[in-house]
């Protein structure tokens, strides 16, 4: 006979009082990930296009990135976050729309920096698509 299922006790997220933070927008060709942390690097909130219910090629759209950024901003504002530095990484289509969504959410953006890694002729890139 199977043993009864154990209840999983989830730890309630405590409300930190943080005013300054860092937002990382990672826009890939397939998805957009937004992470908001405090200045020490402790993550306050995160969200992705896939976590917001978009599947397949819809994850890579600017609208999906906007929805994910709005969700992440709402979670971070529960901790009292007001001022944000934004780091954008990747070539995806959700870069600008995620940034605009963070701005529209009421964050005071102090600076925006593009931290996309650029190879000095490193790995061979993927072959071109033939449609």
Swiss-Prot record:
Give the superkingdom in one word. Answer: Bacteria
Tell me one GO biological process term: translation
Listed GO cellular component terms? ribonucleoprotein complex; ribosome
Q: Which InterPro entries match?
A: Ribosomal_uS11 (IPR001971), Ribosomal_uS11_bac-type (IPR019981), Ribosomal_uS11_CS (IPR018102), Ribosomal_uS11_sf (IPR036967)
Q: Which UniProt keywords apply?
A: Ribonucleoprotein, Ribosomal protein, RNA-binding, rRNA-binding
Q: Does the keyword rRNA-binding apply?
A: yes
- Note the Pfam families from the entry: Ribosomal_S11 (PF00411)
Question: Which GO-annotated molecular functions does the record name?
Answer: rRNA binding; structural constituent of ribosome
Q: Which SUPFAM superfamilies match?
A: Translational machinery components (SSF53137)
Binding partners and assembly: Part of the 30S ribosomal subunit. Interacts with proteins S7 and S18. Binds to IF-3.
Q: What does this protein do?
A: Located on the platform of the 30S subunit, it bridges several disparate RNA helices of the 16S rRNA. Forms part of the Shine-Dalgarno cleft in the 70S ribosome.
Family per record = Belongs to the universal ribosomal protein uS11 family.
Name the UniProt record assigns to this protein: Small ribosomal subunit protein uS11
Identify the coding gene: rpsK
């Amino acid at each position: 006979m199977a043993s009864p299922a154990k209840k999983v006790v989830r730890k309630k997220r405590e409300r930190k009082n943080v005013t300054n933070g860092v937002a990382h927008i990672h826009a890939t060709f397939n998805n957009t990930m937004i992470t908001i942390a405090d200045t020490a690097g402790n993550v306050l909130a995160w969200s992705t296009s896939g976590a917001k219910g978009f599947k397949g090629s819809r994850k890579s759209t600017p609208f999906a990135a906007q929805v994910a950024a709005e969700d992440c901003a709402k979670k971070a504002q529960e901790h009292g976050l007001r001022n944000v530095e934004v780091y954008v990484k990747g070539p995806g289509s959700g870069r600008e729309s995620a940034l605009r969504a963070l701005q529209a959410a009421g964050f005071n953006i102090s600076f925006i920096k593009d931290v996309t890694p650029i190879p000095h002729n490193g790995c061979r890139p993927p072959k071109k698509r033939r449609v």
